[in-house]
Every structure is written in C-alpha cells, then in structure tokens.
Amino acid sequence: MEKEGKYIYCIIASSMDRMFGPLGIGGRKEDVLTVSYNDLSMVVSSHPLGKVAVNRDNLLTHERIIEKVMQEFDSVLPVRFGTFAASADEIRNLLGRRYCPEDS
C-alpha cells in the first residue's frame, strides 16, 4: 500500500482553519483543507505520495480548487501541479522555515 501524503494546491495568507469540501485530486474526492503555521496556510488534500497522472481531470481539479480558494481569499499563491509533502507536520515545518512576519 502506498504511503499517504498531502497534495498541495496553493498557499494563502490566513491562519483560519478552513475546509473546502470533498474536492481532492485523483478522483478520490478527499477533503480539501488548510494546514497552518501562524498566518500562512497551505491548501491540501490527502493523496498517496508519488506522481499524479497528468490528465485533463486532474489538471482541471487542481485549477478549480485554486479558483475556489481565490473566491474567498485575496492573497493566494498557486503551487505547481504535482507537488506533495509527506505530512501536515512537514508542511508546518516548511512554512515555519519560510515565515517572515510583516513587522520584520
């Protein structure tokens, strides 16, 4: 069985826990949600680690999720198709290493 990881769609300027619904990539319809560190969050869904098939359905799912996030948040940084993290903890560590408060 393949190890589960987190498929990353985008980064937003928000600390709010947010669930976007069962929209995840790969036909699995996993919940799309935020993983946060201070006032930054990555929008992710669970997915087996590894490659995601490059096909119309997956590309459109990736794009539609980013568009849905953009309807609610002003500061959205899309992430390249096919980007994974091993876990929510890895995402928090990555955000923490890159975090720079506005007051700095």
Question: What is the role of each PLM region?
Answer:
Residues 1-100, 104:
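An interfacial alpha-helical scaffold signature
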